[in-house]
């Protein structure tokens, strides 16, 4: 992109202009005028580029070009205009009749800039020296592309911008950072177990990470005597040694606290629970059925354990006592009243132990205290 070259620059002469070339160019312009600089070298018979011919004519061969060295007054004016306009050499040259912009630019770069920026030379103009700036030239030159103002550098501007951006980011981070808040990482939940280590944590509303990401480096508390072990009620804390950095084991203490809090929440809820109410209702119905049964303790035990009403020992004693009682009732004895009275009064009956055992067995029932304890357990909510 851009402007097309003025010529092919093939076979053209380069370097310094000779006196013969200056004479040919001056004669052609005096006869035909400046015209088109692209066609001028070919028409004039010069082996030069059109741009080279234009610069040679404007900067050296023109009749109104002021020759000679730049005076001290002109230096002062150049310095003041450069401080105001910057590197806008065409606009500066318009205030010097007979001086070209190229000449002023070369003089600034070769003499004035070195003296000002290297040696810090101060130019003091005469009291009667005044600089008059033509405002019409300033307005007309605004349409052109001007140079940079003195003291301005793209590198310095970018460096200042980077510095300001970095400082603003630092200030924002300081404002948003809540500070290194120390928080107990291995403390017990109750007040009876004091914290044994402190860890630096981020915001409390941050999402959960993996177990490895939740591990934090903690510092031992020198005031605690058992700080080397690092074990607390909530979870173990392992460390390298008593003085080195400690690491909190990747155990999820939050789940335990959440489970306990869930149980507390269930116990403190006023609304009934569907499953729990169903179990309690079924158990209460079974207890009511047991109390509604019309049975003695033997029947109650048989119904409870699914066995006979009497145990095996009681059955054997009753079977042994029945034949003896039958024999005593069926044998005829004429002296039965006297013998019975005498036997009852004086002689021990040989069947007395069996009868006593049978009577004791008949009156033997399950332990009342055991049944009361069983009833209490049955009515309780242990099951």
Curated annotation (Swiss-Prot):
Residues 37-61, 89-112 bind DNA. One of its GO terms (cellular component) is nucleus. SUPFAM superfamilies: Homeodomain-like. Residues 155-170, 191-207 have a biased composition (Low complexity). This gene has been successfully introduced to maize resulting in transgenic plants that show resistance to fungal pathogens C.graminicola and C.heterostrophus, which cause anthracnose leaf blight (ALB) and southern corn leaf blight, respectively, in this important cereal crop. The enhanced resistance of the maize plants is due to production of 3-deoxyanthocyanidin (3-DA) phytoalexins, specifically luteolinidin, and the higher levels of preformed flavonoids, especially flavan-4-ols, induced by this gene. Residues 136-250 are annotated as: Disordered. Signal peptide: none annotated. GO terms for molecular function: DNA-binding transcription factor activity; sequence-specific DNA binding. One of its GO terms (biological process) is positive regulation of defense response to insect. Residues 9-61, 62-116 form the HTH myb-type domain. Disruption phenotype: Lack of this gene leads to loss of visible red pigments in pericarp of the seeds, glumes and mature leaves, all of which are white as a result. Leads to loss of flavan-4-ols production in developing seeds and loss of 3-deoxyanthocyanidins (3-DAs) in seeds at 24 days after anthesis (daa). A variegated pigmentation phenotype in seed pericarp and leaves is produced by an insertion of a transposon called candystripe1 (cs1) into this gene. Spontaneous excision of the transposon restores normal function of this gene. It holds the Pfam family P_C. This is Transcription factor Y1. The gene is y1.
């Amino acid at each position: 992109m851009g402007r097309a070259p003025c010529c092919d620059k093939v076979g053209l002469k380069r370097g310094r202009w000779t006196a013969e070339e200056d004479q040919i160019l001056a004669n052609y312009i005096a006869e035909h005028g400046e015209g088109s600089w692209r066609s001028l070298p070919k028409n004039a018979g010069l082996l030069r580029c059109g741009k080279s011919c234009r610069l040679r004519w404007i900067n050296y061969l023109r009749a109104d070009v002021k020759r000679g060295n730049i005076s001290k007054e002109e230096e002062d004016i150049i310095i003041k205009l450069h401080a105001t306009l910057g590197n806008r050499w065409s606009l500066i040259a318009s205030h010097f009749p007979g001086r070209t912009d190229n000449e002023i630019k070369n003089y600034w770069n070769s003499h004035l800039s070195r003296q000002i920026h290297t040696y810090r030379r101060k130019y003091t103009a005469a009291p009667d020296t005044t600089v008059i700036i033509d405002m019409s030239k300033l307005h007309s030159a605004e349409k052109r592309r001007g140079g940079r103002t003195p003291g301005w550098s793209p590198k310095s501007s970018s460096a200042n911008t980077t510095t300001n951006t970095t400082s603003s980011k630092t200030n924002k981070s300081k404002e948003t950072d809540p500070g290194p808040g120390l928080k107990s990482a291995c403390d017990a939940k109750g007040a009876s177990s004091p914290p044994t280590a402190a860890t630096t944590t981020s915001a409390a509303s941050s999402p959960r990470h993996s177990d490895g990401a939740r591990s934090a480096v903690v510092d031992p508390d020198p005031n605690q005597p058992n700080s080397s072990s690092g074990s607390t009620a909530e979870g173990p804390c392992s460390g390298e040694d008593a003085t080195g950095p400690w690491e909190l084991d990747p155990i999820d203490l939050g789940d335990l606290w959440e489970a306990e809090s869930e149980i507390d929440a269930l116990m403190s809820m006023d609304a009934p629970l569907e499953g729990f109410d169903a179990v309690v209702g079924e158990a209460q119905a079974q207890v009511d059925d047991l109390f509604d049964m019309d049975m003695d303790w033997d029947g109650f035990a048989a119904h409870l354990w699914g066995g006979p009403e009497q145990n095996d020992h009681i059955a054997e004693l009753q079977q042994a006592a029945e034949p003896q009682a039958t024999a005593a009732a069926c044998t005829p004895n004429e002296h039965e009243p006297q013998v019975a009275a005498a036997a009852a009064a004086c002689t021990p009956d040989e069947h007395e132990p069996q009868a006593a055992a049978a009577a004791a067995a008949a009156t033997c029932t399950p332990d009342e205290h055991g049944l009361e304890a069983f009833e209490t357990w049955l009515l309780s909510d242990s099951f």
